[in-house]
């Protein structure tokens, strides 16, 4: 049974993990997991929140949609949020959906519930705003409240008219009508695009190739240059609407018929059905011809047809109550497992990849499949040469789901204990399923990400040294490690394109200004797993200097090595027990076994130790000098919530810590003061329920001023 503390910890993990996958899928068009695995994470989050409603987080995935917009396109605030849909995975889920509609509307048992049903296109959500029938704005969904302005790009898509036409249903469209739908790429067009990109490449081995039609559509629409979008075969299908000044009908089908009459494409398989039985019959018909459709779909969407019922049903946090997406099961095929390779991700995770005899799954030729982790390899007992069942889950990432050649007399396939990229040790922490490379600072697979983190705002914060420059310097061999950043000179920069006297001088000055970073920023910049800003600050305050911190780390490494030597071969129970003992040596409030073990793994790796020593030849972390002022919040716990209008959250935190207060992220019985700005929600209510003192931003400013 899950305890409350375990549930809170798991919800925090799920919030971060789902946000990461949202960013990969919606923001970078590069998903790492299948739709089915993503849906499983969402269902786990929903189940925990249902059991522990008081633990629902402000950043809960149940409240969020998509991913934040990227930086290279202008942002657009949606007049009405572009929400996601809840999912159905079985016939019973659809029956339950109709039942919930009946109960919510208090309908009689004999009153029919009409639905619309249409294929769920696997594309990129887009809104088209027409004013007086003329297209004035197009935007991506983004995070649901803010998207990206893609108007210029959308104007190049043949399916999308510049001006709506009058139709048999309506002489002219309303003054304002925002049409929503999916930008997609047909399967044949996708294959032709990849073939053209391959033919046009100077080096075929380096040719840009899209993984699937959805990625191709998303990457093509979100271009800075509309000319690139125009060269890509994009299409559009309408499925709904957002802000409107008037509606042409009182049913979902009636409005969609009007949209089609105005000149926007609507699915040929959009129909009206009565109740769950007819909905499921249409689902079966669509599923049967799925492979023959010209575009990828991953299910069927049902919506309550009557708009007055839709209005009464309303919305939950991230989805309407009047609609649901009925997902298709994954498609499968048999093939030969030729080999198992290990890929190292940007964060050091080792992922086994199956190399397969080419096989067609759901109309797509599959040659690779994920094996997830060492435990999954053991569960399947797969070895090169086995016949396996491949599943194209969610139409995105193929995976092996069954081994047809299982032989329990064989030894398990040996998962590598060293990183194939750099040779550093691969470690698996207690309770985790993934092996990770411990050679973070020197591992080629991780270097660019580590370098980007090293110079980021909350780490060394080197102004003017962003990801583009990092990638360029790394590609040309100028910066391979953090220490190399400090070896750059103005003369080196001036030999490169687009660098002038002023820009080169400014960057070198910004780099030199960081040769004495605060100890906590230096520690955070190293990118040690589990050592975030707060943990780095706690360790820096406890040990005050790099010398003091390093002495503690050396003692911890010696203790770990002695324990291993005394007991010989280790297991997870031994590792967990040892980690607790190491945490006692670290002796820092808030730093537990997980962090202690991460510190040991990082600094005990010889490659990392060499990289840190090299870095210390270029800079010297500044010692921590406690400068707290006496104040009415000294020794107390403060929580900031809502919007701060005169300062950033980081500035407020720094002020509180300078006054000797501890800043917490959530309200509890141990909280002494809550500073609430506009938009404060559950934290403010909980503070009121617990009788905790509350002040606003002006009151906080007075506390700070009184301590001067």
UniProtKB/Swiss-Prot annotation:
GO terms for biological process: DNA repair; DNA replication. Keywords: DNA damage, DNA repair, DNA replication, Ligase, Magnesium, Manganese, Metal-binding, NAD, Zinc. NAD(+) binds at residues 35-39, 84-85, 118, 141, 182, 303, 327. It catalyses: NAD(+) + (deoxyribonucleotide)n-3'-hydroxyl + 5'-phospho-(deoxyribonucleotide)m = (deoxyribonucleotide)n+m + AMP + beta-nicotinamide D-nucleotide. Zn(2+) binds at residues 419, 422, 437, 443. It is an enzyme of class 6 (ligase). Residues 628-708 form the BRCT domain. The active site is at 120 (n6-amp-lysine intermediate). Its cofactor is Mg(2+); Mn(2+). Its EC number is 6.5.1.2. PROSITE patterns: BRCT, DNA_LIGASE_N1, DNA_LIGASE_N2. One of its GO terms (cellular component) is cytosol. One of its GO terms (molecular function) is metal ion binding. Belongs to the NAD-dependent DNA ligase family. LigA subfamily. HAMAP family: DNA_ligase_A. DNA ligase that catalyzes the formation of phosphodiester linkages between 5'-phosphoryl and 3'-hydroxyl groups in double-stranded DNA using NAD as a coenzyme and as the energy source for the reaction. It is essential for DNA replication and repair of damaged DNA. This is DNA ligase. It comes from Rhizorhabdus wittichii (strain DSM 6014 / CCUG 31198 / JCM 15750 / NBRC 105917 / EY 4224 / RW1) (Sphingomonas wittichii). The lineage of its organism: Bacteria, Pseudomonadati, Pseudomonadota, Alphaproteobacteria, Sphingomonadales. The gene is ligA.
